[in-house]
């Protein structure tokens, strides 16, 4: 007696058991009605329930395979035919199917029916799910069990019970191998259809899923279950095929399935996911494929076809060109809801809004200074490492920031494209122009949290905060004197080197600081009284002793 006949008999007995009174109760209630609760292991040992022995294993089967078969797990092999059984009545036979003896009493029949009901609610093996699960039993599983078994089926054999299969569909796919209608194979299918059994070959299953348009997901599942199959035109491993070398190239099963199953007027896609075209396109290389749609991209992808009409800069995407044009038109469609500042890009607005929240999640591990942006932290860390990745191509001077390099290159070209519309002053950077325009508007958006003084530039606020903290981070390497501003250190170092870069255009006198030059120029332009006051101030400065180094 085969496992299929035993499963059918169990299904028939289960249908008769449903007609008995009390079948609508749960498994626990049925067992409690018949002499109390019976453990599952003892129930299988009932004298009126006999276990059908398994078929003997063929010769050549390993001990590991036999052990897996004893546990109810049968490994699937490539090239074998698997049976998807839709049994009537929702029966769920296992490798060892309980078969009711004809002399069994009604009580034992009720117990067996209850056990069969409990069987459908118990965790079952992959053998049961893959080969003997009916549609009715599949519908009884909850969402978690369906997801679990669907994942198992996808990993093990590529089968999925989520597709609404129909007998004519499979019959049409199985047929077409050169067999005439009414052949012995078709008659065998009709006999198995009476029992609810449909026999499907794995290769035919691959072709059917490919015809359904699910070749992408099926290929990924079959690749995980049986190892990645060779791609189109790819040679198989030397140990997999013992035939001649000319037969090593394996055709693509998905492409063949599409050619066989598609109508004559259907335009098939040129490429499939994971299947590269055998002949490259124009240009010598195959075009890349889209991972989302499975369609080949345009051969022109990667080229910068969108060109700016004003500056000639080219872009690969039209959206990038639209964003770039805003640098010429000055359009800033993204406005900050807190301060009203506008930006040309939404990413710049997001970065700006962190200033209002005061959040500084990025901390330097060397000095523990915090920053609101990760890019600012990276630029700051170059101060500790001394890294200067940006090099001027004309004078080989290096910079830690790209913006500093752009500013420096303006000294070579002399180009100042950013012009102030009020006074006509030009600048090399747009940020410098924005800072300059605050001198006309009087806007000072950076207030000091200690004294409330406002500044037009953030750098001036940082320097001002040192007057409250007393911090002097700039040290002279010659005398050790410290300063709160880098400009003060630069002017001080000129006293050691004797450099006086500021000269008076009238008398030629030189000075080490620009402020001293401005004071000197008033001597030539001021009246006698102002000149006397300047001379007295200069004499007092010369008579005063130099400040002691700190």
From Swiss-Prot:
Disordered: annotated span: 1-67, 174-200, 216-296
Keyword vocabulary terms for this entry: DNA-binding, Isopeptide bond, Metal-binding, Nucleus, Phosphoprotein, Repeat, Transcription, Transcription regulation, Ubl conjugation, Zinc, Zinc-finger
Residue(s) carrying Phosphoserine: 290
Major localization class: nucleus
Zinc finger (C2H2-type): 306-328, 334-356, 362-384, 390-412, 418-440, 446-468, 474-496, 502-524
GO terms, molecular function: DNA-binding transcription factor activity, RNA polymerase II-specific; RNA polymerase II cis-regulatory region sequence-specific DNA binding; zinc ion binding
PROSITE patterns in alphabetical order: KRAB, ZINC_FINGER_C2H2_1, ZINC_FINGER_C2H2_2
Sequence ranges of Basic and acidic residues compositional bias: 11-22, 45-58, 187-200, 267-281
Cross-linked residues, Glycyl lysine isopeptide (Lys-Gly) (interchain with G-Cter in SUMO2): 216
Domain KRAB stretches: 124-193
Superkingdom classification of source: Eukaryota
Listed transmembrane segments: none
UniProt GO cellular component terms: nucleus
Listed CDD domains: KRAB_A-box
Keyword Zinc (UniProt): yes
Subcellular localization, as worded in the UniProt entry: Nucleus
Family as reported in the entry's similarity comment: Belongs to the krueppel C2H2-type zinc-finger protein family.
PANTHER family: PR DOMAIN ZINC FINGER PROTEIN, ZINC FINGER PROTEIN 22
Protein name: Transcriptional repressor RHIT
Source organism of this protein record: Bos taurus (Bovine)
Species lineage: Eukaryota, Metazoa, Chordata, Craniata, Vertebrata
């Amino acid at each position: 007696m085969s496992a299929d006949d035993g499963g059918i008999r169990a299904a028939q007995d289960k249908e008769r058991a449903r007609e008995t009174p009390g079948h609508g109760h749960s498994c626990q209630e049925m067992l409690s009605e018949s002499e109390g609760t019976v453990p599952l292991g003892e129930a299988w040992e009932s004298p009126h329930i006999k276990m059908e022995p398994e078929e003997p294993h063929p010769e050549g089967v390993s001990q590991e395979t036999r052990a897996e078969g004893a546990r109810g797990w049968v490994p699937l092999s490539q090239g074998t035919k698997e049976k998807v059984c839709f049994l009537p009545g929702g029966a769920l036979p296992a490798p060892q199917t309980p078969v009711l003896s004809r002399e069994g009493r009604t009580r034992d029949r009720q117990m067996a029916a209850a056990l069969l009901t409990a069987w459908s609610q118990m965790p079952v093996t992959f053998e049961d799910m893959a080969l003997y699960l009916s549609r009715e039993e599949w519908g009884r599983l909850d969402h978690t069990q369906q997801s679990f078994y669907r994942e198992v089926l996808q990993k093990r054999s590529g089968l999925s019970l989520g597709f609404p299969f129909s007998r004519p569909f499979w019959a049409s796919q199985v047929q077409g191998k050169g067999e005439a209608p009414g052949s012995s194979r078709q008659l065998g299918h009709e006999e198995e259809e009476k029992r609810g059994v449909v026999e499907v070959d794995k290769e035919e299953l691959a072709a059917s899923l490919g015809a359904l348009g699910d070749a992408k997901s099926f290929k990924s599942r079959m690749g995980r279950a049986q190892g990645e199959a060779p791609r189109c035109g790819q040679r198989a491993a030397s140990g997999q095929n013992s035939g001649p070398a000319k037969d090593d190239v394996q055709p693509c099963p998905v492409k063949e399935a599409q050619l066989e199953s598609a109508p004559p007027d259907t335009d098939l896609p040129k490429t499939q996911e994971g299947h590269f075209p055998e002949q490259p396109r124009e240009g010598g290389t195959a075009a890349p494929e889209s991972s989302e749609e499975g369609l080949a991209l345009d051969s022109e992808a990667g080229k910068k076809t969108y060109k700016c009409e004003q500056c000639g800069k080219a872009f690969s995407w039209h959206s990038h060109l639209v964003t770039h044009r805003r640098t010429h038109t000055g359009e800033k469609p993204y406005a900050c809801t807190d301060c009203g500042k506008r930006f040309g890009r939404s990413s710049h607005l997001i970065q700006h809004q962190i200033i209002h929240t005061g959040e500084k999640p990025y901390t330097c591990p060397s000095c523990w200074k915090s920053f609101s942006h990760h890019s600012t932290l990276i630029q700051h860390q170059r101060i500790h490492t001394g890294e200067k990745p940006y090099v001027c191509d004309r004078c080989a001077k290096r910079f830690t920031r790209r913006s500093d390099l752009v500013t420096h290159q303006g000294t070579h070209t002399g180009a100042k494209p950013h012009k102030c519309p009020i006074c006509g002053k030009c600048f090399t950077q747009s940020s410098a122009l924005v800072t300059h325009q605050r001198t006309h508007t009087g806007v000072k958006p950076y207030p000091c949290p200690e004294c409330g003084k406002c500044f037009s530039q953030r750098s001036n606020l940082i320097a001002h905060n040192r007057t409250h903290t007393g911090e002097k981070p700039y040290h002279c390497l010659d005398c050790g004197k410290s300063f709160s501003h880098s400009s003060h250190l630069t002017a001080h170092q000129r006293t050691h080197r004797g450099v006086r870069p500021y000269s008076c255009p009238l008398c030629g006198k030189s000075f080490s600081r620009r402020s001293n030059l401005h004071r000197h120029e008033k001597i030539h332009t001021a009246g006698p009284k102002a000149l006397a006051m300047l001379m007295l101030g200069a004499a007092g400065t010369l008579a005063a002793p130099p400040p002691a180094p700190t």
